[in-house]
């Protein structure tokens, strides 16, 4: 089996890669049947020379590879007929901007495996960059709080060269003793954010304590879906019921918002779910929110202040709940919003290594042995949508 690592072609350029040079070396040494080559790239976080040093061929032509792996969507001009491609296609939610990409993939008889579709027997996703989205997003939230309050001043994440440097930078954080933080979600993203909260030695408390008690040290609460979504009719709720009938629910986040200074949103938002945070919530006299770090970054979605994505180099903008418009985040009654939609790109080396480690451990053995995980992950096969993704037929037509 020959694996080719693509040069990222989408703009703006992405520095990440599925495997680092050391990981390629490890794969080749542990799996005799696997060969790896890599396309040359001037933007990749690892240099071409680093791959050459460990015996990986650097080639422009990947036409003799069995599997071609990238990170972001592959430009149509880089798609090779009758090949197997792995990348984040952003098509399974029927994103209109990638409809043509999927149509061409089918026309070229490409077998497409999207990393998002790789799941275990229980339906749980096995791989993604969510952990580093959470880590960088939480760091950026504290960077935003420092710039909003002028208590401290952190270096922008993309100017740091590693996770170690980010951890070192966190030593500069100085927080008020009465600070309360909400973290939504319980998946990879939110647990990545939790790593940063724990690095800062911020105390985790219960939901009841968060609402009812005063503290003399910074504290946070981690909320799952049913903590901030309740049945409209007051009936007992369950996750199964919520995902089946989200229209029967309403947000109860206001119970927590009136106690919080920072909201870090790391939840997954399903279409049809209730809005989590509204203008009315933010305009309440009881509202203390100063910073919203929306790691999930659903534009015009559940968090009313997320009116556009921000960028890695300019991660902060202000939101005025009185006008529903962008404003100067340094003003007193303006909420500082962090809503970067490509957070892992700030630490591309660490994010790539973390991704590769998971792929090697959880997925590669199944791929080599042609196991059930990978056979279930294909979106397209032999010029058609697979049974699992037949629902995309109307989307592409």
Task: Write out the residue ranges for each language-model feature.
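An N-terminal-biased, well-structured beta-alpha scaffold segment characteristic
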Residues: 2-104
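A structured beta-alpha segment of the ubiquitous adenosine-cofactor-binding alpha/beta core
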Residues: 50-64, 223-288, 340
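Adenosine-phosphate binding glycine-rich loop
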Residues: 113-169, 291, 296-397
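ADP-ribose/adenylate-binding Rossmann-like module
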Residues: 81-116, 262-323
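Glycine-rich phosphate/diphosphate-binding loop of Rossmann-like nucleotide-binding domains
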Residues: 7-41, 153-259
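Phosphate/diphosphate ligand-binding glycine-rich loop within oxidoreductases
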Residues: 67-149
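Short, ordered loop/turn segments at secondary-structure junctions
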Residues: 9, 40-43, 73, 117-120, ...
């Amino acid at each position: 089996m020959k694996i080719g690592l693509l040069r990222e072609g989408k703009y703006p350029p992405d520095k990440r890669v599925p495997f680092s040079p050391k990981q390629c070396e490890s794969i080749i040494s542990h799996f005799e049947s696997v060969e790896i080559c890599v396309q040359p790239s001037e933007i990749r976080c690892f240099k071409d020379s680093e791959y050459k040093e460990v015996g990986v061929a650097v080639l422009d032509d990947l036409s003799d590879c069995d599997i071609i792996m990238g990170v972001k969507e592959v430009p149509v001009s880089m798609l090779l007929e009758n090949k197997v491609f792995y990348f984040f296609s952003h098509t399974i939610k029927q994103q209109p901007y990638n409809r043509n990409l999927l149509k061409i993939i089918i026309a070229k008889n490409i077998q497409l495996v999207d990393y998002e579709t790789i799941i275990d027997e229980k339906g749980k996703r096995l791989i993604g960059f969510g952990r580093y989205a959470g880590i960088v997003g939480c760091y950026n939230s504290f960077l935003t709080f420092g710039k909003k309050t002028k208590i401290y001043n952190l270096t922008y994440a993309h100017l740091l060269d590693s996770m170690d440097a980010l951890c070192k930078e966190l030593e500069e954080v100085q927080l008020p003793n009465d600070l309360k933080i909400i973290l939504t979600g319980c998946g990879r993203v939110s647990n990545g954010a939790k790593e940063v909260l724990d690095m800062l030695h911020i105390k985790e408390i219960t939901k009841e304590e968060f609402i009812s008690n005063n503290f003399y040290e910074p504290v946070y609460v981690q909320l799952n879906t049913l903590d901030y979504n309740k049945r409209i009719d007051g009936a007992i709720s369950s996750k199964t019921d919520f995902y089946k009938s989200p229209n029967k629910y309403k947000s109860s986040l206001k119970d927590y918002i009136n106690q919080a200074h920072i909201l870090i949103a790391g939840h997954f938002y399903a279409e049809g779910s209730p809005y989590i945070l509204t203008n009315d919530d933010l305009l309440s006299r009881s509202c203390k929110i100063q910073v919203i770090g929306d790691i999930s970054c659903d534009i015009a979605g559940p968090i009313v202040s997320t009116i556009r994505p921000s960028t890695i180099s300019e991660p902060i903008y202000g939101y005025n709940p009185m006008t529903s418009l962008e404003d100067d985040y340094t003003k007193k009654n303006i909420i500082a919003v962090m809503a970067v939609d490509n957070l892992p790109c700030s630490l591309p080396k660490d994010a790539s290594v973390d991704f590769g480690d998971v792929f090697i451990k959880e997925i590669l053995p199944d791929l080599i042995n042609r196991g059930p995980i990978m056979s279930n992950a294909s979106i397209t096969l032999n010029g058609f949508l697979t049974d699992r993704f037949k629902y995309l037929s109307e989307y592409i037509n």
